[in-house]
Structures are given as C-alpha cells and as structure tokens.
Design a protein with these regions (language model features):
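A short helix->loop->beta-strand "cap" motif at the edges of active sites that frequently abuts
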Residues: 106-113
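A charged, well-structured terminal subsegment
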Residues: 142-161
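Glycine-rich, charge-decorated loop segments at or immediately adjacent to ligand/cofactor-binding or catalytic sites
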Residues: 116-137
Length: 161
C-alpha cells in the first residue's frame, strides 16, 4: 500500500468520524450566553457518558475571549479537540459572541459545529435576523432551531449512545 493510500480517510470524507457506528461518540456541548448556559447546566445534571459540557455565560468583552473561556472552567480546547461531535447551544437573545472562538478550535481539527438555537414558540417573529442567530450561523455548518429545550438532552443522549 502506498503512503498516499494510507492517508486517505477510510470512509471517504475528511473530518468524517472514522469508526463504525457501534462505537459510542464523544460529544462536547458548549452553552453560550445565560440561556444556553442554563440548557448546558441542565444537560450536565443528567451525567451522560461521553458528553463534556462547557458553559460560556460571559461575553467576550473586547478581545478578551480567552479570559471569558477560562472563566467557564474546564479545558475547552482539549475537550473540543477530543470530541467526535461539537454542539453550541443558545437561546434567542443570548450573547453568542464566543461562538466563533469555539468554531475556530473545532475547525482547526476539521470538526463541524452544530448550533442548537432555542426559540420559544411565543417569541415574536420578525424579518430581522437577531445577533444570536447571526453569531451561530457564522460558526456552524448545521443550525437546528428548536422550540422546546427538552429536545436538546434527548438528541444528545441519542447521538452519544
């Protein structure tokens, strides 16, 4: 076998998980803003195996994104580098200014980011795109809009199993 053939991903696409579906997935969930942080904290209470939770409730004031991430505790970069799947979660109106930082770490490892955007059904709909949605769209390859945050733990549990 040539060196070129050895470097080609087993399943064809770079960044795709290179293991059979029977292997449990490692998932990193990052809660952004106060609402996303609450969803992430609730998810952490369920203590799901193979799921690392990070809370980034503070905003990235100026260029001090590193300080805001360090205030969240844990080792975000390590967990994102080791994860098979990366999710960011935020509620409508949350400060998601740290989403691009999470995205840069994930993309440095060729990992896609999925954004979970919680918009309650009673939230007023407007034609204008809000700042939270704009930040999530700029970071994520896939955006999932949900009206009920109880969907988030169920989805993560299914994907991690």
């Amino acid at each position: 076998m040539t060196l070129v053939a050895q470097k080609k991903p087993a399943f064809g696409l770079p960044g795709r998980i290179q293991a059979p579906n029977s292997k449990p997935r490692s998932i990193a969930v990052v809660g952004l803003g106060s609402g996303g942080a609450a969803v992430a904290r609730e998810l952490s209470r369920e203590r799901q195996p193979n799921v690392e939770i990070h809370v980034l409730a503070k905003s990235a004031a100026g260029s001090d994104a590193v300080a805001a991430i360090q205030a969240g505790g844990g080792d975000l970069q390590r967990d994102l580098m080791n994860a098979d799947m990366i999710f960011v979660v935020a509620r409508k109106g949350d400060d998601a200014s740290l989403a691009p930082v999470v995205g840069r770490i994930a993309h440095s490892r060729n990992h896609p980011v999925t954004a979970l955007y919680v918009v309650p059904p009673e939230a007023p709909l407007t034609d204008a795109e809000d700042e939270t949605l704009r930040a999530l769209r700029s970071t994520a390859e896939m955006l999932v809009v949900v009206s009920d945050e109880s969907y988030v733990p169920a989805m993560i549990a299914t994907l991690a199993s």
